[in-house]
């Protein structure tokens, strides 16, 4: 049942711009799959779905592509389109994102594999990054700003 449900979720988000868990649950019900909001939430986590900016300017669920080059490019785009500000304080970097984008942006940061990053912690709209030194925190900020500039944001 779970595998079938996951396949249906992936099919639905590929065909339709689904913005909320409630919309996804409703579409699944229309397809004959009875589901609770809690199960939808778990499925989203298990499938590692992310929210991306759709063509209509609204955020929608999307699956992470398996191709490593496509994945890196998509994550860099997610990062550059969701970050509001980046600043360093001592050996920490604080990244502010659009509301609800913290986890996706943190995943993108982790995928950039900056050697200066010791670890990241993400919230709804804020990411804390720990660098090993204050100099490395400054370098992380420079690199992040470069990624944002290169993406034309």
From Swiss-Prot:
Location of this chain's protein in the cell: Cytoplasm
Q: List the pathway annotation.
A: Amino-acid biosynthesis; L-arginine biosynthesis [regulation]
Q: Name one GO molecular function term.
A: DNA binding
Q: Which Pfam families match?
A: Arg_repressor, Arg_repressor_C
Q: Which UniProt keywords apply?
A: Amino-acid biosynthesis, Arginine biosynthesis, Cytoplasm, DNA-binding, Repressor, Transcription, Transcription regulation
What InterPro entries does the annotation carry?
A: Arg_repress (IPR001669), Arg_repress_C (IPR020899), Arg_repress_C_sf (IPR036251), Arg_repress_DNA-bd (IPR020900), WH-like_DNA-bd_sf (IPR036388), WH_DNA-bd_sf (IPR036390)
Cellular component aspect of the GO annotation: cytoplasm
The protein's matches in SUPFAM superfamilies, at most eight in alphabetical order, are given as: C-terminal domain of arginine repressor, Winged helix' DNA-binding domain
Gene Ontology biological-process annotations: L-arginine biosynthetic process; protein complex oligomerization; regulation of arginine biosynthetic process
Q: Which HAMAP family match?
A: Arg_repressor
Q: What does this protein do?
A: Regulates arginine biosynthesis genes.
| Family the UniProt entry places it in | Belongs to the ArgR family.
The record ties this protein, via PANTHER family, to: ARGININE REPRESSOR
What is this protein's record name?
Arginine repressor
């Amino acid at each position: 049942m779970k595998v079938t449900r996951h396949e249906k979720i992936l099919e639905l988000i590929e065909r339709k711009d689904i913005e909320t868990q409630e919309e996804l649950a409703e579409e699944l019900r229309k397809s004959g799959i009875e589901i609770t909001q809690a199960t939808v939430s778990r499925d989203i986590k298990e499938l590692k779905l992310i929210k991306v900016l759709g063509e209509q300017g609204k955020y929608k669920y999307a699956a992470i592509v398996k191709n490593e080059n496509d994945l890196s490019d998509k994550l860099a785009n997610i990062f550059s389109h969701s970050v509001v500000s980046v600043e360093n304080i001592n050996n920490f970097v604080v990244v502010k994102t659009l509301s609800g984008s913290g986890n996706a942006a943190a995943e993108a940061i982790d995928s950039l594999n900056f050697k200066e990053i010791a670890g990241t912690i993400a919230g709804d709209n804020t990411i804390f990054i720990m660098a090993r030194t204050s100099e490395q925190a400054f370098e992380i900020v420079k690199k992040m700003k470069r990624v944002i500039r290169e993406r034309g944001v």
